[in-house]
Amino acid sequence: MAEKRNIFLVGPMGAGKSTIGRQIARQLHLEFYDSDSEIERRTGAEISWVFELEGEEGFRAREEKVIEELTENMGIVLATGGGSVMSKESRNRLSARGVVVYLKTPIEKQLARTQRDKRRPLIAEAEDPRKVLEELAQERDPLYEEIADITVQTDEQSAKFVVNDIIEQLESINGLG
């Protein structure tokens, strides 16, 4: 790669941001970060515990700080948390400091991928996870679209196909690869 440019993955929970991000980083020889994992590393606690103790507002403040710091690096792939786009500052940083890839995933796939994951505080205790995901999509989808340079559907394709599709699009818009 002539120019090391950051790649930021956004999208709802269960879109495959971490899985896809790791594979992109591996193929392009970039460093991979996951904002949720970074928060867990820094706090020494699971996201659900941070949510329980500090509420969503406290968690979002931590997330914003992590995104601010990580986006200052060059040559990284960052999988962001699904709600990271709720912060205007984070949206601005992501847009200004790299290529934003929106992994678009239907509610059905999100449900299938997240139904047994107790580490997702917004749906773990929900009576109706589908309704929660639909409400989150209504609120967040326009924000993902607002900052996306590339949008890729992740519902029916394999991770390998999605990764190759993203890399091809990155090469065409940026000369990456």
Swiss-Prot record:
Spell out the GO cellular component terms annotated for this protein, sorted alphabetically and separated by semicolons. Answer: cytosol
What does the cofactor section's free text say about binding?
Answer: Binds 1 Mg(2+) ion per subunit.
Q: Write down the PROSITE patterns for this protein, in alphabetical order.
A: SHIKIMATE_KINASE (PS01128)
Which InterPro entries does the protein's record reference? P-loop_NTPase, Shikimate/glucono_kinase, Shikimate_kinase/TSH1, Shikimate_kinase_CS
Any Pfam family the entry gives: SKI
Q: Which domain of life is it from?
A: Bacteria
> Which keywords are on file for this protein?
Amino-acid biosynthesis, Aromatic amino acid biosynthesis, ATP-binding, Cytoplasm, Kinase, Magnesium, Metal-binding, Nucleotide-binding, Transferase
Q: Which cofactor does it need?
A: Mg(2+)
Its UniProt entry gives the catalysed reaction(s) as: shikimate + ATP = 3-phosphoshikimate + ADP + H(+)
Describe the family membership recorded for this protein in Swiss-Prot or TrEMBL.
Belongs to the shikimate kinase family.
Instruction: Report what the protein is called.
Output: Shikimate kinase
Gene name tied to this protein: aroK
